[in-house]
Amino acid sequence: MTKNYPTVSEDYKKAVEKCRRKLRGLIAEKNCAPIMVRLAWHSAGTFDCQSRTGGPFGTMRFDAEQAHGANSGIHIALRLLDPIREQFPTISFADFHQLAGVVAVEVTGGPDIPFHPGREDKPQPPPEGRLPDATKGCDHLRDVFAKQMGLSDKDIVALSGAHTLGRCHKDRSGFEGAWTSNPLIFDNSYFKELLSGEKEGLLQLVSDKALLDDPVFRPLVEKYAADEDAFFADYAEAHMKLSELGFADA
């Protein structure tokens, strides 16, 4: 989709770049990249392309959205970000939360993701129930990512690769464990682990294993496991698309 990005002031651009530097320091110091990616994703992943509601527009600042079942633990990310947020009151929450996700991928060795500022904060959160359910398979993934958000099959598989970061916590998601042996490094090991089968101590969700059973998804899993550069290129594109759902559409 063609984008028509809003014009932002030079002062705003400078604030964003200074904020980016502060975020790099925080995320590296606190080892909190995974939860920053989760914050950005869960903010953006509520977008519905039919009603044009939800999306990456700062509504995670509301207690009501933080209270959604899928967002358990998100308040930890927001609390970590508060000291930086206070330094940049002119930056929208929408831009701030998406920038944190972009920087988190970069700091952990992942691809550089283009970031375009200018998102406006929406006044109310979306309804609960729009984020993907880890206990469901390919049809559900396509319902959420393709029909609801408007993303492609390639985007679905590339974005799944961000599970290379972080781990599940029983008290937040009902699941426990990391997908890879080094959950603070962004690389293609998620796909390698997926193809090698289940291992003691590592996690594979129903929604992960479903990628292997689909005739479109599986070749992409195999491609990304064999070629990290290809994964990085497709991930950067998919992450940018996710972070801009409903934003600057021409």
From Swiss-Prot:
<dbReference type="GO" id="GO:0005829">
    <property type="term" value="C:cytosol"/>
</dbReference>
<feature type="binding site">
    <location>
        <position position="182"/>
    </location>
    <ligand>
        <name>K(+)</name>
    </ligand>
</feature>
<keyword id="KW-0630">Potassium</keyword>
<keyword id="KW-0597">Phosphoprotein</keyword>
<keyword id="KW-0479">Metal-binding</keyword>
<dbReference type="GO" id="GO:0009505">
    <property type="term" value="C:plant-type cell wall"/>
</dbReference>
<dbReference type="GO" id="GO:0034599">
    <property type="term" value="P:cellular response to oxidative stress"/>
</dbReference>
<feature type="binding site">
    <location>
        <position position="180"/>
    </location>
    <ligand>
        <name>K(+)</name>
    </ligand>
</feature>
<dbReference type="Pfam" id="PF00141">
    <property type="entry name" value="peroxidase"/>
</dbReference>
<dbReference type="GO" id="GO:0009699">
    <property type="term" value="P:phenylpropanoid biosynthetic process"/>
</dbReference>
<dbReference type="GO" id="GO:0042744">
    <property type="term" value="P:hydrogen peroxide catabolic process"/>
</dbReference>
<keyword id="KW-0560">Oxidoreductase</keyword>
<feature type="binding site">
    <location>
        <position position="185"/>
    </location>
    <ligand>
        <name>K(+)</name>
    </ligand>
</feature>
<dbReference type="GO" id="GO:0046872">
    <property type="term" value="F:metal ion binding"/>
</dbReference>
<dbReference type="GO" id="GO:0000302">
    <property type="term" value="P:response to reactive oxygen species"/>
</dbReference>
<keyword id="KW-0106">Calcium</keyword>
<feature type="binding site">
    <location>
        <position position="164"/>
    </location>
    <ligand>
        <name>K(+)</name>
    </ligand>
</feature>
<dbReference type="GO" id="GO:0009570">
    <property type="term" value="C:chloroplast stroma"/>
</dbReference>
<protein>
    <recommendedName>
        <fullName>L-ascorbate peroxidase 1, cytosolic</fullName>
        <ecNumber>1.11.1.11</ecNumber>
    </recommendedName>
</protein>
<feature type="active site" description="Proton acceptor">
    <location>
        <position position="42"/>
    </location>
</feature>
<dbReference type="GO" id="GO:0005794">
    <property type="term" value="C:Golgi apparatus"/>
</dbReference>
<dbReference type="InterPro" id="IPR002016">
    <property type="entry name" value="Haem_peroxidase"/>
</dbReference>
<dbReference type="GO" id="GO:0046409">
    <property type="term" value="F:p-coumarate 3-hydroxylase activity"/>
</dbReference>
<feature type="binding site" description="axial binding residue">
    <location>
        <position position="163"/>
    </location>
    <ligand>
        <name>heme b</name>
    </ligand>
</feature>
<dbReference type="InterPro" id="IPR044831">
    <property type="entry name" value="Ccp1-like"/>
</dbReference>
<feature type="binding site">
    <location>
        <position position="187"/>
    </location>
    <ligand>
        <name>K(+)</name>
    </ligand>
</feature>
<dbReference type="GO" id="GO:0009408">
    <property type="term" value="P:response to heat"/>
</dbReference>
<comment type="similarity">
    <text>Belongs to the peroxidase family. Ascorbate peroxidase subfamily.</text>
</comment>
<comment type="function">
    <text>Plays a key role in hydrogen peroxide removal. Constitutes a central component of the reactive oxygen gene network.</text>
</comment>
<dbReference type="GO" id="GO:0005886">
    <property type="term" value="C:plasma membrane"/>
</dbReference>
<dbReference type="InterPro" id="IPR010255">
    <property type="entry name" value="Haem_peroxidase_sf"/>
</dbReference>
<dbReference type="GO" id="GO:0020037">
    <property type="term" value="F:heme binding"/>
</dbReference>
<dbReference type="InterPro" id="IPR019794">
    <property type="entry name" value="Peroxidases_AS"/>
</dbReference>
<dbReference type="GO" id="GO:0009506">
    <property type="term" value="C:plasmodesma"/>
</dbReference>
<dbReference type="GO" id="GO:0009507">
    <property type="term" value="C:chloroplast"/>
</dbReference>
<dbReference type="GO" id="GO:0005576">
    <property type="term" value="C:extracellular region"/>
</dbReference>
<keyword id="KW-0349">Heme</keyword>
<keyword id="KW-0963">Cytoplasm</keyword>
<feature type="region of interest" description="Disordered">
    <location>
        <begin position="111"/>
        <end position="134"/>
    </location>
</feature>
<feature type="modified residue" description="Phosphoserine">
    <location>
        <position position="196"/>
    </location>
</feature>
<dbReference type="GO" id="GO:0016688">
    <property type="term" value="F:L-ascorbate peroxidase activity"/>
</dbReference>
<keyword id="KW-0376">Hydrogen peroxide</keyword>
